């Protein structure tokens, strides 16, 4: 019988990743023995692997995060290639966030939301309350000045939030979470990128069949041709994968 409250780790190019078998494993791991874990969740895909390789500050930030997991299918395939016995699957960050919010609503876990446009954040709050009765104890859109950060950290601490989700894009959200944890360490932090936009319908995700086939990247490219430069950059990751330089 599998123990869902523990998980193996796998190393790709020096980065340690948690190996979750599926979404249920991820949730059981994060809520082991009914106690929500504390630390920082970071989704890892091929693009982020390249950024880690090229940017020492980002590498240090992400290495310090406790829970790094495979959000991209390319990363999952690389783990399976390097560790043939690995039982690891993709856990999409947007899906994990929704499942965490549903669980938080069920258990009354206090949540603080950071980031996004004001109108998107307001819609996110309303939908979370209506859909799962989430206990949102505070929020702040992404349009605040650097000199306001410390006061925001204090607000988060005073709120007693046990889950803090930050939608600011990488590496801004990782920097924010690192600094906020100095003031409010007793929480689970999650960087969620554009998840609020997807959740409220402002941005469309790839249909399920594209996700299942591992072609979400292609759907995004067809929807946003301007992403071509970002996609071409990923050829370097493919070279690592196919040459076994993992």
From Swiss-Prot:
InterPro entries reported for this sequence: UDP-ManNAcA_Trfase_WecG, WecG_TagA_CpsF
Organism domain of life: Bacteria
Any GO MF annotation of the entry: lipopolysaccharide N-acetylmannosaminouronosyltransferase activity
CDD domains xrefs: Glyco_transf_WecG_TagA
UniProt pathway annotation: Bacterial outer membrane biogenesis; enterobacterial common antigen biosynthesis
Catalytic activity: UDP-N-acetyl-alpha-D-mannosaminouronate + N-acetyl-alpha-D-glucosaminyl-di-trans,octa-cis-undecaprenyl diphosphate = beta-D-ManNAcA-(1->4)-alpha-D-GlcNAc-di-trans,octa-cis-undecaprenyl diphosphate + UDP + H(+)
One GO BP annotation of this record: enterobacterial common antigen biosynthetic process
Record-listed E.C. numbers: 2.4.1.180
UniProt keyword list: Glycosyltransferase, Transferase
Function: Catalyzes the synthesis of Und-PP-GlcNAc-ManNAcA (Lipid II), the second lipid-linked intermediate involved in enterobacterial common antigen (ECA) synthesis.
HAMAP family given in the database record: WecG_RffM
PANTHER family registered for this protein in UniProt: PTHR34136, UDP-N-ACETYL-D-MANNOSAMINURONIC ACID TRANSFERASE
Family: Belongs to the glycosyltransferase 26 family.
The protein, known as: UDP-N-acetyl-D-mannosaminuronic acid transferase
Organism: Escherichia coli O139:H28 (strain E24377A / ETEC)
Gene expressing this chain: wecG
């Amino acid at each position: 019988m599998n123990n869902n409250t523990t998980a193996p780790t796998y190393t790709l190019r020096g980065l340690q990743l948690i190996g979750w078998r599926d979404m249920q494993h991820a949730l059981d791991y994060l809520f082991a023995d009914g106690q929500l874990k504390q630390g920082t969740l970071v989704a890892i895909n091929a693009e982020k692997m390249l950024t880690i390789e090229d940017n020492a500050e980002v590498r240090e930030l992400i290495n310090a995060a406790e829970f790094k997991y495979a959000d991209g299918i390319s990363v999952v395939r690389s783990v399976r290639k390097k560790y043939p016995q690995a039982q690891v699957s993709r856990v999409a960050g947007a899906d994990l966030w929704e499942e965490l919010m549903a669980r938080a609503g069920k258990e009354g876990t206090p949540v603080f939301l950071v980031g996004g446009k004001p109108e998107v954040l307001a819609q996110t709050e309303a939908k979370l309350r209506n859909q799962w009765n989430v206990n949102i104890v505070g929020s702040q859109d992404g349009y605040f000045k650097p000199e306001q950060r410390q006061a925001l950290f204090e607000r988060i601490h005073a709120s007693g939030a046990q889950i803090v989700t930050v939608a600011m894009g990488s590496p801004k959200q990782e920097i924010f979470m690192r600094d906020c944890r100095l003031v409010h360490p007793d929480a689970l932090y999650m960087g969620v990128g554009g998840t609020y936009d997807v959740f409220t319908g402002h941005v469309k995700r790839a249909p399920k069949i594209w996700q299942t086939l591992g072609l979400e990247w292609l759907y995004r490219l067809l929807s946003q041709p301007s992403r071509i430069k970002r996609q071409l950059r990923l050829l370097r990751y493919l070279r690592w994968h196919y040459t076994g330089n993992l």
